[in-house]
């Protein structure tokens, strides 16, 4: 194995461990060669682009990624992933075109006997194209038709078993204001995410091969963002119990995930507001449609913190938001997303009684104190309007 091959392998291993800075450090000796003797090396261009992207340096990744796509137009050397990444960065009609090129490359290679990996990549490409149609191209007259056609293809390819496809379907239904159908789609998404998480977890525990195990661990961590996105979409249609199950899965993967804690606290906050609304408006039949409307008017619902029916919900909200603040103590002050989450957690806590004492959080973390809610039956809030 040459020095270059060893470097590429080590850099890929670092990226699999979600350590982009380490990967860039490993690659540094070959940086200047990208403009000289290794200018036409597809794999080196790809791994440099991946490292820059994972490190949040899109502007540095873009020209290198474009070069890789130019050098390997059929994806025969480095595979199709670069086309999907490039298309997502570009967006618009150009983005759709280059992602479609990647999809066609896989289809031409696999023919009628596509492997599971090839199907997964094609579906990922289809969902990326849908995202572009729902954002950059949403004002085009055929946008809705394109989304419907593409999601149907994705469903057919995965036999209706892809959690990501169900999540995207739910997002489409929200855009169409079909909130009941969105609710059902998100419930299905969670069912299949749960199965996927269990399968990957079992593979990690049972696999003795170090390389394969590292790959599975990377897949496990990769579930975080789609799960967090699903949580946020569940909240839009009042699928609160589903959201809490998804958040529990997030915690299994990353115990100190700040966004997960924030979303958990926000979910309980919404549930407490909804409980007050129900008590004050018993004649209203709650459904995903008016839960969506309710979310738009959430600030107008006053909270009485002494009101017994919501006391446990308020406590659970304070608990999760307090953990979010605790997890953010050592966060990068320049990370705008994290700082926004911490600001949101602080704002909610001011409304519901402030953070819990750090000593109480420590005891709960150790298991010395049990959250009272664990001994209560699950609230049936959403069942009343999910039919």
UniProtKB/Swiss-Prot annotation:
Cited InterPro entries: TPR-like_helical_dom_sf
Localization (cell): Cytoplasm; Nucleus
Signal peptide span: none
GO biological process annotation, one example: protein import into mitochondrial matrix
Gene: ACL4
Family, per entry: Belongs to the ACL4 family.
Protein's name according to its UniProt entry: Assembly chaperone of RPL4
Chain intervals with Acidic residues compositional bias: 371-387
């Amino acid at each position: 194995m040459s020095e270059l091959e060893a470097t590429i392998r080590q850099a890929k291993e670092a990226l699999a461990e979600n350590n982009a800075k380490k990967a860039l450090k490993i690659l540094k000796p070959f940086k200047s060669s990208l403009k000289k003797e290794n200018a036409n090396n597809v794999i080196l261009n790809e791994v440099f682009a991946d490292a820059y992207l994972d490190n949040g340096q899109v502007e540095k990744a873009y020209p290198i990624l474009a070069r890789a796509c130019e050098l390997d137009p059929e994806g025969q050397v480095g595979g199709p992933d670069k086309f999907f990444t490039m298309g997502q960065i570009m967006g618009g009609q150009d983005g759709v075109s280059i992602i479609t090129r990647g999809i066609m490359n896989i289809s031409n290679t696999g023919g009628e006997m596509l492997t599971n990996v090839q199907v997964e990549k094609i579906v990922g490409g289809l969902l990326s194209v849908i995202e572009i149609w729902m954002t950059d191209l949403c004002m085009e007259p055929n946008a809705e038709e394109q989304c419907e056609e593409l999601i149907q293809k994705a469903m057919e390819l995965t036999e209706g078993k892809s959690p990501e496809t169900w999540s995207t379907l739910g997002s489409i239904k929200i855009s169409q204001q079909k909130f009941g159908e969105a609710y059902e789609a998100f419930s299905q998404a969670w069912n299949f995410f749960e199965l996927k998480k269990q399968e990957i977890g079992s593979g990690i525990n049972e696999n003795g091969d170090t390389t394969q195990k590292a790959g599975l661990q990377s897949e496990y961590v990769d579930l975080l963002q789609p799960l967090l996105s699903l949580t946020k979409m569940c909240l839009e249609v009042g699928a609160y119990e589903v959201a809490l199950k998804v958040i529990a899965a997030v915690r299994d993967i990353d115990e100190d995930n700040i966004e997960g804690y924030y979303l958990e606290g926000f979910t309980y906050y919404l549930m407490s507001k909804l409980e007050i609304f129900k008590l004050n408006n018993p004649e209203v039949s709650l459904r995903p449609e008016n839960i969506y409307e309710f979310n738009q008017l959430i600030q107008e619902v006053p909270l009485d913190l002494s009101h017994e029916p919501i006391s446990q919900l308020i406590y659970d909200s304070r608990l999760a938001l307090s953990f979010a603040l605790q997890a953010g103590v050592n966060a990068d002050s320049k990370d705008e997303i994290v700082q926004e989450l911490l600001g949101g957690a602080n704002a909610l806590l001011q409304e519901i009684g402030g953070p819990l004492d750090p000593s109480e959080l420590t005891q709960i973390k150790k298991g010395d104190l049990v959250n009272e809610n664990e001994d209560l039956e699950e609230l049936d809030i959403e069942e009343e309007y999910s039919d």
